[in-house]
Amino acid sequence: MLHFKTIALLSSVTLIGCTSSPHAWQGQSGSKRVFIELETTPEGTSQAFLSLPEQWIDKAKADTLVLSDESILAIFNRENIRFEGSFHSGKDSIQAEVTTYGKTREFALGKVDSLQPIYFAQNPRPPYPYRSEEVTYVSCDSIQVAGTLTIPQGKGPFPAAIIISGTGKQDRDGTFSGHKPFFKIADYLTRQGFIVLRADDRGTGKTNGIYEEATTSDFARDAQAGINYLKQRPETDTKHIGVIGHSEGGQVALMLGADSPDVSFVISLAGVGVDGLQILKLQNDAILRTTPGMTPERVYQFMSLFNTLFDKVHSVPLEQPLDIPLRQAFDQWVAQQDEATLKAVNFNDGKDEMFFSRYLHQAQGRWYREMINYDPENYIPRIHKPVLALNGDKDIMVPAKENLESIKQLLDKGGNTQYKIVELPGLNHMFQRCKECTREEIPDLEDVFSKEALQIMGDWLRENVQKDRK
């Protein structure tokens, strides 16, 4: 805890040594930025304004401000925020503790002129030893896809790859909380001599369309449209075009590896290797087990409910409505539970009906129903080209053991001997070296994308793609 020489709390005081122009400092802790400004009014009183961009707080004015040559305390009543810090290096920096929503983070702030973008050291930065182009192409349903094409220096043609994103609307860089993993992959591979195409998802960035109305099959068609675009580029070696997919994008990559004659290699990054019903069960079980305060008994109780619902959705033919059979399965499960179990899964005070309504809405969607009926046996045994499958052993979204094992078994079933499967220790679903390895931790980790995973990809591509071109 930081301490102060003064104990009086005043709503406004004169800022020692400050002029009428504002002074500003900014710091970052994980994926959270803090930006504080101190300024003096014409009447000579001092004011503090705080911005927390990732928490949608912009220039909140301090209700209480205590300043000295050594320290600052600013309290923001409405937002229930406390900023407590000590000045260093002639007030060029502040070591601070910022408390929001009952949680305290430590920040090292430096003096700035204005709010700066969120920063992660592993994100690529210029100058880049390659050419970048903003490109557009048309997919099915007249979707206008926008993306970035990176082209190596030198004389082509070059082998090429398209990066395919996972579940959820993502921009071309795969941006989450300031991390840009797809940009990092593209930067690395382009430096290794590959053309790389990465694109905004439907309804994201500069790509039109409605993401929520699309299915995995639609995403596969969007990726094929990107491959078709690559084939038209004179810099592309059309005999060596590959797909690199993350999570659901890994599933799409495996589908295209089976169905598209244009694909010459496949890289699955935490890609789904089991059927849709199993991935739902594996994922929810893994997430629950890593949730703070979740006991094994409560995991069992939640999974009993979830598995009942998943099994029912999976059993209903796609052309038939879900509402009645799902309602019956849900009511039957509730009727069979004791009061302790219903309380454990938060089914009290009408919350059971709220839960059912939300789940029914999700389960009735085209994407969900196609996903839960996905069967990798329809695709992976038909892949007869080089495949690299990577997973982190701390992945709770696409658990590594079961998914990698299934990919291997299905490749073997089809007679494919050109594959490499690697389970990477200590990495989560986003290929970050994790600590607690929970979903909540992901945004705050410094890793953007594992250097080890990139090295494996680069080595494998040299051996299986670039060597083959010579």
Q: Model regions: which residues?
A:
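N-terminal cap/lid segment of alpha/beta-hydrolase-fold proteins
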Residues: G30, S114-G156
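Alpha/beta-hydrolase active-site loop
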Residues: E213-P234
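Short beta-strand element of the alpha/beta-hydrolase
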Residues: P157-T167
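Conserved alpha/beta-hydrolase "acid-adjacent" motif
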Residues: I396-E402
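Short amphipathic alpha-helix adjacent to the substrate-entry channel of hydrolases
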Residues: T175-V196
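Accessory cap/linker subdomain of secreted extracellular hydrolases
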Residues: L269-P381
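Short beta-strand/loop motif that positions the catalytic acidic residue
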Residues: I383, A389-N391, D395
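Central antiparallel beta-sheet cores of small beta-barrel/beta-sandwich binding domains
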Residues: P22-F87, S93-T100, F182
